[in-house]
Structure formats: structure tokens, C-alpha cells
């Protein structure tokens, strides 16, 4: 059964933005969070898997997402875009606030089913990427690794880059690893198949 038969992925809208739990939606709809470095392509990932051009605002300027953005998908699922980490031009105080906001959501939200952790397929994961993965594993939060910008890596080097990313993360082979490109539309079905396993 395809994701379209289970939910209409094109029936999506931004629901609200929240700074803390008092602003979270008050229902039991399952949520999948999206985490990753600033400019890793979270907004492009959201727009691509939902078949929309600008539902999530993309920006070449890192640090654009400053709140938890909740996207309603067919009244059956929410995608939650959390602020990108690792953006150096944000003040320490602002980084600390973002960190607290993300940690509060990830560790206390009952609706959370899994986290899509996005990494840049072109490069070795950053220390922030590694810490995020370790954080999710420590709290036993199901994690899906999505390696973005695969179109920038020649296909003949994909195996090498996948091995590099997995080795750096000390990757748990029971977790999903998806190679993704919003430009070439690679990994969309695999992303949905994996997300739907957690609903």
C-alpha cells in the first residue's frame, strides 16, 4: 500500500509555530520531527516529500527556522521542523535557547514517534550531527538518517560516502539510512515507507 492510499500527502499545511510546550498542538496526532544542521535541506525535504514548492520556506541563509514549526499532513500526521543547529552566527544565548527548546520537545513530547535526522551526504557528519544522533540513541528515540544533497555526489561514490557517514555516526544498523535528493527526487518513497512504519 502506498503512502497516497494511507494519507493524502498533498493535503498539507503549516499548522502553527511554537517556542515551548504550552504552544504545542493539544491532541494525540503522531508526530515525526526533523532535525539537522542549518542549511542541510530540511525545508527542501519537507517540500519535496509533500509535493509542494514552498510550504516550508527554504533559505540560503542558515538559522532561518527559530521555532518548532508544526505541519499538518492530511489530519493524520504532523511533521515538526526544529531549529537547525550548528549555526555559528547566532549568539550563545540564542543557541542555548534553541537547544533547550529542541531538548524539551524531543524528551517530553508524547506524540513524537521518530526523528528524521538529516545529514549532508557530501561531507563527514559534524560534531553536532554526531551529538544529535547520540542524544537520540541515549533517549531511545527512533531515528531515521536521511542523507541529503545526494545529487552533488557522483553515484559511483555513494557507497564510499554512505560508509563514511555511518562510520562517523557509529551507526546502528537497525536504524534506517536513506539517500535523498530534492533536486533529483531520490528517496521520496523510501522516506514515506519508513515514516509510515512509525504511525
Swiss-Prot record:
GO annotations of cellular component type: cytosol
Gene Ontology molecular function, alphabetical: GTP binding; metal ion binding
Functional description taken from the UniProt entry: Necessary for normal cell division and for the maintenance of normal septation.
Pfam family, any one: MMR_HSR1
Keyword terms: Cell cycle, Cell division, GTP-binding, Magnesium, Metal-binding, Nucleotide-binding, Septation
Biological-process GO terms, alphabetical: division septum assembly
Cofactor(s) demanded: Mg(2+)
Keyword Metal-binding: yes
Family: Belongs to the TRAFAC class TrmE-Era-EngA-EngB-Septin-like GTPase superfamily. EngB GTPase family.
InterPro entries referenced in this protein's UniProt entry, alphabetically: G_ENGB_dom (IPR030393), GTP-bd (IPR006073), GTP-bd_ribosome_bio_YsxC (IPR019987), P-loop_NTPase (IPR027417), Small_GTP-bd (IPR005225)
Manganese is among the record's keywords: no
Positions contributing to GTP binding: 36-43, 63-67, 81-84, 148-151, 180-182
Residue ranges annotated for the EngB-type G domain, each copy included: 28-199
Record protein name field: Probable GTP-binding protein EngB
Binding positions (Mg(2+)): 43, 65
Matching PANTHER family: ENGB-TYPE G DOMAIN-CONTAINING PROTEIN (PTHR11649:SF13), MSS1/TRME-RELATED GTP-BINDING PROTEIN (PTHR11649)
